[in-house]
Each structure stands twice: as structure tokens, then as C-alpha cells.
Swiss-Prot record:
The keyword Endoplasmic reticulum does not apply. GO terms for biological process: rRNA 5'-end processing. GO terms for molecular function: nuclease activity. GO terms for cellular component: cytosol. SUPFAM superfamilies: Ribonuclease H-like (SSF53098). It comes from the Bacteria. Could be a nuclease involved in processing of the 5'-end of pre-16S rRNA. It is an enzyme of class 3 (hydrolase). This is Putative pre-16S rRNA nuclease. The keyword Cytoplasm applies.
Amino acid sequence: MGTVLAFDFGEKRIGVATGETMLCSAHPLTTIHAESNEDRFAAIGKLVAEWQPEQLVVGLPTHADGTPHEMTRLATKFGERLARRFNLPVSFADERLTSLDAEARLRETGRNSKSAKPLLDAVAAQLILQTWFESPHHVIPTQPSA
């Protein structure tokens, strides 16, 4: 397949990770800090142009029992916009506990919460992508719509 970009969607920040399907390994890339959707999608557009992914993955937040909540709806809407805007397939991957896992991983590297904050969302996106690589049966694909 090729390159994949993954997103940890948030209302204030979007973490981004990249990976290769041949290696099934994910790496944190960046965190997008943008107020408006226009600025967010412009930044994502630059990443799509640079990395030329064949697939996009969006973390799908849910309650611990798997039931949806407001951020589930917003992340789904974000994924649908990605599919339409970039004409790329988008999959949703379970992101339960990825932020906690990302915090723990950054603490293990000796970073305190303040110094780790800029990396947190990108590491969460990395974990989302790694989950997608390891658990293809847990993804919910969507194709770009006209």
C-alpha cells in the first residue's frame, strides 16, 4: 500500500503521525495548532502534499464501554471532511486510552507534562496509527463521497 497519515482530532489541536504499511510502524509527526477549520485543513493539505499518503486514519473517541459521545461525532465529521477534501480513503480506529498511553510514554522518556505537551497529540496519533496497523478488523473505512 504505502504511506498513511493518522490524526488525533481535538477541538484545539490535531496530532499527526505517519507510517508505512510495509513496515507497519508509526511515528509522531507534528501537532497542528489552528483556530479555524480553514487553517487546520490548509496545514493538513501541506502534509498531504508532502507525504502523499494513500490512506488516512482518524482516531475515534468513545466512552470506555465503546458508546459514542460528542467528540465521536466531531471526529467522524472531521474524517468525512478529510475524505471529501483530499479524495483519499479514511478509516476510523479506536482511540480509547491513547492519550493516557501517550502521556505514560512521554514520562518514560523523562519529560515532564509541561515539556511533553507539544508532543502529546502527535504521540497519541502515533498510537492510533499503530493500533490501526495491528488491528485491521477494528477499523471502520469510509470512501470519499461526491
